[in-house]
Curated annotation (Swiss-Prot):
Gene Ontology cellular component annotations, sorted alphabetically: cytoplasm; ribonucleoprotein complex; ribosome
Family: Belongs to the bacterial ribosomal protein bL36 family.
Protein name: Large ribosomal subunit protein bL36
Record carries keyword Ribosomal protein: yes
One GO BP: translation
Gene name of the encoded protein: rpmJ
UniProt organism field: Lactococcus lactis subsp. cremoris (strain MG1363)
Keywords from the named record: Ribonucleoprotein, Ribosomal protein
Keyword Ribosomal protein: yes
């Protein structure tokens, strides 16, 4: 899980979602692409 000021989808499978008011990227294809805005 990377925590960065701006989150962007890295590949075609990345999804941008909101959880508890936080913007996150989840990726079923490549778990390294997981990000959270912080």
């Amino acid at each position: 899980m990377k925590v960065r000021p701006s989150v962007k989808p890295i590949c075609e499978y990345c999804k941008v979602i909101r959880r508890n008011g936080r913007v996150m990227v989840i990726c079923p294809a490549n778990p390294k692409h997981k990000q959270r805005q912080g």
